[in-house]
């Protein structure tokens, strides 16, 4: 296999992985669980410091297995019952009794959470204290990227420069663009990418869960009721929107099922997966072609998102759905040029969507971007595309760079304003 393709597969394996619960509070749970491995006894108090963006994305989302919202319960559950070896599935086996113990610690005022000034978009420092013993774990740059461990002030681990590479810079120094992703997905041996079918399995289970039980705003179930009442039809557009939103409903509502995440986001993993899976079913393609489309969607999303910080004021579901739309064109037998049209169209459609924290209404944003993916894919198949208008350049690579500029240079103050509003 080509060395470049091996790099691509390595990138996918690094940032497309199962995650139980919204990854921002789960980062605190993971840091707490790792810190607990350093202490000889259970902690008596917990202190959590996080970046503004991590704080924003933890304020309104349920922590799986707890039925509760926020960083305090995530850190306490992680410290008392988390599995430090499980990464983003750290809370998979938490029991109701352990949740009660965590809540007791919180009720006693022993769990403190505060924002801290930092240049890192993903930053979480958790300190556990038991008597005179203190363990500290610091995460920087990625949701499970441990930068430092200390016990009683003594440094016991520090990440080297290679280990400390932020998830947002994962494509740095790699020869990658939309065309190379497209060719890779088409030509790489199937057995080398078969693993990506796990994304279909995990995220489809979340979708089924969201359709069968009342989670969050029940966006998916509401659409199902509309279909049953004859108000809307069960066409490809509505089916994709309904099932993608249902998976997000379940995830943001605290379902005890993992999502296959994309670059640290479960919702974006869902947005990169479910529309592609439903389109594959519509066109009755082979399992191999589905795997190739999922690789195209997930790696395309990673590449586009590598142009801006992993947490920002920009809702990443937009560009994730652009990559999904590209893969949908491939499934329908469209050309590479038409796949580029799909990316351009989605970004033109919904690039103004902001991130105001992780919460139940994220399912609505997922449904919005998925709807844009379907419209854009249909337009692309008809060779209709947005080009040279607004932030959309004539070339797809320039458009992607424009998105990066918009987020980095134009939306930093927006992010601060959103966080300040949410903190009032």
From Swiss-Prot:
One Pfam entry name: SDH_alpha
Query: Member of which family?
Result: Belongs to the UPF0597 family.
Please give the HAMAP family that the UniProt record associates with this protein. Answer: UPF0597
In the record, biological process GO terms are: L-cysteine catabolic process to pyruvate
Q: Name one GO molecular function term.
A: L-cysteine desulfhydrase activity
Name which cysteines form disulfide bonds: none
Q: What is this protein called?
A: UPF0597 protein Shewana3_2972
């Amino acid at each position: 296999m080509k060395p470049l393709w091996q790099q691509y597969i390595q990138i996918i394996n690094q940032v497309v992985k199962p995650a139980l619960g919204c990854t921002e509070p789960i980062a605190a749970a993971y840091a707490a669980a790792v810190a607990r491995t350093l202490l000889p006894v259970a902690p008596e108090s917990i202190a959590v410091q996080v970046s503004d963006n991590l704080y924003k994305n933890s304020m309104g989302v349920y922590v799986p297995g707890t039925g509760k919202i926020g960083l305090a319960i995530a850190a306490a559950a992680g410290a008392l019952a988390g599995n430090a070896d499980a990464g983003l599935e750290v809370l998979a086996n938490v029991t109701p009794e352990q949740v009660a113990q965590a809540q007791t610690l919180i009720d006693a005022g022993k769990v403190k959470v505060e924002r801290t000034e930092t240049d890192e978009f993903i930053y979480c420092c958790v300190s556990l204290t038991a008597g005179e013993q203190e363990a500290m774990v610091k995460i920087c740059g990625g949701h499970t990227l441990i930068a430092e461990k200390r016990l009683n002030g003594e440094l016991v681990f520090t990440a080297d420069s290679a280990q400390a590479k932020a998830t947002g810079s994962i494509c740095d120094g790699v020869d990658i663009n939309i065309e190379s992703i497209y060719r890779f997905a088409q030509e790489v041996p199937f057995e080398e990418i078969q693993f990506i079918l796990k994304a279909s399995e995990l995220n489809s289970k979340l979708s089924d869960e969201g359709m069968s039980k009342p989670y969050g705003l029940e966006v998916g179930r509401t659409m199902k009721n509309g279909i049953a009442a004859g108000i809307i039809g069960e066409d490809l557009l509505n089916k994709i929107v309904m099932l993608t939103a249902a998976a997000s409903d379940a995830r943001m509502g605290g379902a005890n099922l993992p999502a296959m995440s994309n670059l640290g986001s479960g919702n974006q993993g869902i947005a990169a997966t479910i529309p592609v899976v439903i389109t594959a079913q519509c066109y009755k393609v082979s399992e191999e072609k589905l795997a190739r489309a999922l690789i195209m969607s997930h790696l395309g999303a990673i590449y586009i998102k590598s142009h801006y910080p992993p947490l920002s004021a920009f809702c990443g579901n937009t560009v994730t759905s652009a990559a999904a739309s590209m893969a949908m064109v491939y499934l329908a037998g469209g050309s590479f040029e038409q796949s580029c049209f799909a990316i351009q169209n989605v970004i033109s459609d919904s690039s103004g969507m902001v991130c105001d924290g992780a919460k139940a209404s994220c399912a609505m944003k997922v449904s919005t971007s998925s709807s844009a993916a379907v419209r854009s894919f249909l337009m692309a198949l008809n060779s209709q595309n947005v080009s040279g208008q607004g932030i959309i350049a004539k070339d797809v690579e320039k458009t992607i760079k424009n998105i990066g500029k918009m987020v980095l240079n134009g939306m930093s103050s927006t992010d601060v304003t959103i966080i300040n509003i949410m903190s009032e």
